Amino acid sequence: HRTVLENITDPLNYAKKMNKEDAKRKAVELLQMVGLEEKAGQYPRKLSGGQQQRVGIARAMAVEPKVILFDEPTSSLDPELVKAVLRVIKRLSDQKQTMVIVTHEMQFAKLISDKIVFLDDAVIQEEGSTKELFENSENVRLRNFLQAISLDDL
C-alpha cells in the first residue's frame, strides 16, 4: 500500500528522523542509483521481480547500513533481469559497501569479492581470497563444484 518512493522515505523519516524534503531528496538519489527514478510513484506490486529487488536495495541503502546481507538476490529472477540487479550490487561493491552475499553466481562472486566462504551442507569447507579459492583450492568439494558449473568444457 506504499509507493516505491514511500517505501524508501518511510525508514528515513522514522528510523533516521529525517525531514520529509531531505528524505525525498535522498530517496530520489537512491532510485537514480538503482536505475528506477521513473518508478517512484508506482507500487512495488506493479514492478518486475528485478525492479522490486532494486527497490529493496535502495531501501536498505537509505539507512546507511554498515553491512548489507543478500540471500540469493537473483535466484527467483528471470534471466533478463539478473544483470540489472548484479549491476547495482557491483556498484555498491565499487563504493566499498560491506556485503555478505549468499549466491550461486560464482563468476559474479569472483568479480566483486575480497573474501569468499564456500559452504556445503551448511558447513564451511574453505574460506579465503578470491584467488585462493578459484585458483589454488586444495578442497576437493570446491574444485568439483567449480568444475561442475564451468562452461569451459562444453
Region spans (language model):
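A short, surface-exposed alpha-helical micro-motif characterized by mixed small hydrophobic
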Residues: 109-111
